[in-house]
From Swiss-Prot:
Residues 8-54 form the F-box domain. Pfam families: F-box, FBA_3. SUPFAM superfamilies: F-box domain (SSF81383). This is F-box protein At1g47810. InterPro entries: F-box-assoc_dom_typ3, F-box-assoc_interact_dom, F-box-like_dom_sf, F-box_dom. PROSITE patterns: FBOX (PS50181). NCBIfam families: F_box_assoc_1.
Length: 351
């Protein structure tokens, strides 16, 4: 036994560049485990060069674009169980036998009834044990999902079902908006948090995920404002709607936050003829920020910001959902964004 241990210790360690290549060809769920094996392995996997190479390899090899579905099941109090699924956006797959597949949540079986296809592939699940209610819809940016429950913020990786809790703000501060963004140049995720206290109308703090000093830092905002809709991140820039007054009844503005320079500015005022029966939705429309308005009876309007300096918006079109589809979805539809092909993605408000 002693001879065996000595022979193992005498073996030359695997070169770092070889480990780098080995890890590149492994699934993400194994890498999540390997960070606990040794400090060297964790250092390689968390290295920014490795993260960029792994992301590029995954994108290149994944020839089929996929949609991510998230379903929640509230157990008790404010505890939520989240289930994540993915589905190819290519040619529809054949119908399946309803009893041939068992899913974690019975509500998922309604997917087949809605679209007439087999349900998506199960990815992972995660449980959120929180003390307060979630007032903001989760946001999805470059593979990560952000949740906000009162003053508690959670970032989840749906590919592996792992999540982390972000550091809390001061006890006297109330979060009124939290937005997740991704900077593709430096391969960094950042969270922009808007809060109010007795000392200020609206403060702005930023946190960089994965930084050695993972703490909130204050940034300056030249124009005080109150956040409105959820955000959209395009090429390292976060956009969200806001009002310069205390309520969202004031004229709406489009706020721009550059993740690289961490600068905030009012990018534009919403179009004069913009009207909506619900809060507007911001999406990435062919590389430009766009806003959707919802009318009644399944009609939607789309405005695209063509030139922020000239305050130039173009109204692309008015989209009408077929009455037959609306009749099957009495709970209504919401706009989630667009696919890589520029297709607008709608989803039921509730399943």
């Amino acid at each position: 036994m002693a001879d065996t241990e000595k022979s193992l210790q005498s073996l030359d360690p695997i070169p770092v560049d070889v480990l780098f290549e080995i890890f590149l060809n492994l699934p993400a769920k194994f890498l999540a485990r390997f960070v606990c094996v040794s400090k060297l392995w964790a250092k390689i996997i968390r290295n920014q060069d490795f993260i960029r190479s792994f992301s590029f390899r995954s994108f290149r090899e994944n020839k089929q674009h996929r949609l991510l579905f998230a379903f929640k099941n509230q157990i008790k109090g404010y505890q939520e169980n989240w289930y994540f699924f993915s589905k190819s956006t290519h040619v529809s797959t054949p119908l399946y036998e309803p009893n041939s597949l068992v899913l974690p949540d019975q509500n998922i079986n309604k997917f087949e009834a809605l679209v007439g296809e087999e349900p998506p592939d199960f990815e992972s699940s995660t449980v959120c044990h929180l003390k307060k209610m979630r007032y903001q819809n989760p946001s999805y940016v470059h593979g990560l999902i952000s949740f906000l429950y009162g003053e508690e913020q959670i970032i989840c990786n749906p590919s592996i079902g792992k999540s982390i809790n972000l550091p809390t703000l001061g006890s006297s501060e109330t979060i009124i908006g939290s937005f997740l963004g991704y900077d593709p140049i430096h391969a960094q995720y950042k969270v922009l948090c808007l809060n109010k206290s007795s000392l200020q109308f609206c403060g702005h703090q930023v946190l960089t995920l994965g930084a050695q000093n993972c703490s909130w830092r204050m940034i300056q905002c030249p124009t005080p404002h109150y956040p409105g809709t959820t955000s959209v991140c395009i090429d390292g820039v976060l956009y969200y709607s806001a009002s310069r007054g205390f309520t969202m009844h004031e004229p709406l503005n489009l706020v721009r936050f550059d993740l690289r320079t961490e600068s905030l500015e009012i990018a534009s005022v919403f179009p004069e003829d913009f009207k909506s029966s619900v809060k507007p939705s911001l999406i990435n429309y062919r590389g430009k920020v766009a806003v959707f308005s919802k009318y009644f009876c399944g009609d939607f309007g789309l405005w695209v910001l063509e030139d922020a300096k000239k305050q130039q918006w173009s109204k692309e079109q008015r989209i009408s959902i077929r009455r037959g589809v609306i009749g099957r979805l009495p709970q209504g539809l919401q706009i989630l964004g667009t696919s890589d092909m520029g297709e607008v993605i709608f989803a039921p408000n509730y399943f």
